[in-house]
Amino acid sequence: MSDDKRAKSDKNEKNKYPVNLLDTPFPMRGDLPKREPQWVKQWQDKQLYKKIRAARKGAKKFVLHDGPPYANGDIHIGHAVNKVLKDMIIKARGLTGLDAVYVPGWDCHGMPIEIQIEKKFGKGLPVQEVQAKARAYATEQIKRQMVDFERLGVLGDWDHPYLTMNYRNEADELRALGKIMEKGYVFRGLKPVNWCFDCGSALAEAEVEYKDKVDLSIDVGFPFAEADKLAHAFKVPVEQIDARPGWIVIWTTTPWTIPSNQALNVHPEVEYALVDTPRGHLILATERVEEQLKVYALEGKVIATATGAALSEIRFHHPLAKMDGGYDRLSPIYLGDYVTTDTGSGIVHSAPAYGVEDFQSCKAHGMPDSDIISPVMGNGVYAGTLPLFGGLSIWDANPRIVEALQESGNLFNSHKYTHSYMHCWRHKTPIIYRATSQWFAGMDVDPAEENGKPVPTLRETALAGIDATEFYPAWGKQRLHNMIANRPDWTLSRQRQWGVPMAFFVHKETGALHPRTPELLEAIAKRVEQQGIEAWQTLDPAELLGDEASQYEKNRDTLDVWFDSGTTHWTVIRGSHRDDLYDPSADEADGRLADLYLEGSDQHRGWFHSSLLTASMLYGKPPYKALLTHGFTVDGEGRKMSKSIGNTVSPQDIANKMGAEIIRLWVASTDYSGELSISDEILKRVVESYRRIRNTLRFLLSNLSDYDHGKHALPAAEWLEIDRYAVALTAQLQKEVLSHYEAYEFHPVVAKLQTFCSEDLGGFYLDVLKDRLYTTAPDSKARRAAQNALYHITQAMLHWMAPFLSFTAEEAWQVFAHGTAHTDTIFTSTYYAVPEVDDADDLLQKWHTLREVRAEVTRQLEAVRVEGEIGSSLQAELTIQAGGPVLEALQSLGDDLRFVLLTSAAKVTAAPEAGDLLVTVTPSAHAKCERCWHYRADVGHNPDHPTLCGRCDSNLFGAGEHRSHA
């Protein structure tokens, strides 16, 4: 009988023969969009996070250090995933009794905010004004984002977040810079760095993304200049070389770099051919001759070969020399192991200002910085002094360069070519490598000795740190290892306004740092601590340098924003939030301050990366014990979220329409190690899952509404057997749930909770229990035993779900725990200690068998119902034939077996064969009890109550029925 039907029946009969149908203030409808904001306000008003911390005072700390989101724009679904995952971990760890600390943070400096200030107020503002407006803008953005994060049910120290723009944090960042300078990691040099013309600044590796780009691909000939050396290398007469024009041919997809060419590269071990063609002699890699001649539409014959090593230092004319005397220079061949013969001619042209390998090759051959030709300015335009192309942007110059090469007679082929190319992640525009004078943290420099002993390089220290770190999922370790192993020096400097200054004084003539730089940095940091980075702008050098001020100038570079967030283990954990986050015991143990860093998979090259490098320089260790990575959100078809596609999902919209609890349950039920798919259809399924869990909770709370554990608790030995089984099953599941939480695995917890609610409880235990709960005497031992089990199940279940269904668990807890020590909130309690059941293993095995029998019985009952012979299962009587342990289990229940199988009678006999299970269903010939709806022979045995069966008569007016098993 359904609860609704019983309620209607009870009402219609005016409780003539009442059943124990109780109610609860916990409603069936969650009405989440309306109720959740009330919970958020209540948590804020009673300072819930502070209460939780107070309850855990003195406990071991668990520190999840927040990777700061950028203070610009509304939060998106990726932010929601990130914050909910963090919140679930903090709550799950807190429920173990740990002092789980969460201080949210924001990344505040950098280009995106500068762009917003330019949009609102125009370009050309004084630096101080830009900084003031940027600070105000970031503050406003943080307020907006904070509201949305709290709306998601995320608990943390929202009253005291950390901000990279806080004066103290800015000052401590300068102190961190001073520290790594003293240790010998920082140097200044000319190097090609990732450069964005729109940013007007160098970019970090993490700020570069790759997209397809269509470029002009060209094959360019560099005319022979040293025939005698070529003749010697190829072992042919010099007259043969001189007899015809000749070129060494290169292939490139960046025509704009040709004006800056200063060398050519060949592989020392590759064989190169001197090829005779109708156009003249060509030098190509031997294995590329056939393919390249087709491209050039030429016939040809190899007349000699030589290794790349034999061609070393031979020089060739610049291909634009005939067009303008400014290009009248020679390009030597340098050997390079990186040259391949997969595509092109097997020869690479080298413009050291615009390629990392080009630069390294030319520097290795003694080219001084002053000789490097670098005509491209920071805005992507050639300097006006560049012959032929001065004043043009490099992209506009590409076709002009091709025309000039054609006119000079040195172009062999040009065509459009699609390839993966570097783009700025902010502007989505192509970027280049550009040699500029920058400040670097050297990956392979030898740091200063400590205590007279050599210190490993930054690369070595960081790689060792990775080996000492736990990764969730495990594949993250190799990914980060590969990035660190292969990365170039870290470009620390940026050419921006809204950022922490690299507050150095540089000698005007020599470019050398002031000899008292560490001391001066501390003096500047003290000013920044009081006035913010603006203090550097207003500082008169004479205040610190005295008479030397005229010899020095302020360095105008700012620090990479990845240094801002990458040093928060120093500026926040050891600095501004030391009282909350710093754990001296962890520091003394191994120096790793945070238990966990958790971010999206892009942060292997972002925050995980920069934090590892800064901590390796400062302490020689990572700042974290473990790294957890989550995937990106995609739509139901696996496509990335994109405004242009129109498939973006707003967490604010979901919270307002369905409830933040639905976002939380979606995050928890998804395997975050891969992509997280979200769509309307997926969210509908999540809503259904939520309803099932909520309905289970409502049933539990309703049937516990007259239960007081202090008065009605019974020892486990006095419970019915099925109750002991249900609690044993709960205890078994609790071990699995806590094990998953310990490993940061949430989707198995949700899956098991759903199965527990729908199959173990709704599909079995609660289904069996309804008769006992509703029909036995209210204060009978049989009913109180059932309530004992429900109490323990509810305690455990509310704690399992609290980390992800926080609003719902808290709402249910207020009903369930009313009047207890933890009435205020579930989050100051700990995971429930589910009582031990002595015969748990035997019970679990026995009732597993009984449930298998029940499943077969249900199938047989359904077949008979479909035939129209019965309506409900209570109209049926069963005869079951079984053997072996199955027979033993069935017989052990006696008359209680009918309650387990939801029939009015169940008879068990031995089967002909031990392994048989035969079920016979017979429609009952007896009358139906008006109260319990069972069909029994004793209905009407008491003439005073002719519509009641014997047990209902006894439960209402006599001593009550006796139950042992179910």
UniProtKB/Swiss-Prot annotation:
Chemical reaction(s) catalysed: tRNA(Ile) + L-isoleucine + ATP = L-isoleucyl-tRNA(Ile) + AMP + diphosphate
Motif ('HIGH' region) on chain: 69-79
Entry keyword Ligase: yes
Biological processes, Gene Ontology terms: isoleucyl-tRNA aminoacylation
Required cofactor names: Zn(2+)
Region feature Disordered, mapped onto this chain: 1-24
GO molecular function: aminoacyl-tRNA deacylase activity; ATP binding; isoleucine-tRNA ligase activity; tRNA binding; zinc ion binding
Cofactor info, note text: Binds 1 zinc ion per subunit.
Keywords: Aminoacyl-tRNA synthetase, ATP-binding, Cytoplasm, Ligase, Metal-binding, Nucleotide-binding, Protein biosynthesis, Zinc
Designated name of the protein: Isoleucine--tRNA ligase
Source organism per UniProt: Cupriavidus taiwanensis (strain DSM 17343 / BCRC 17206 / CCUG 44338 / CIP 107171 / LMG 19424 / R1) (Ralstonia taiwanensis (strain LMG 19424))
Gene this protein is translated from: ileS
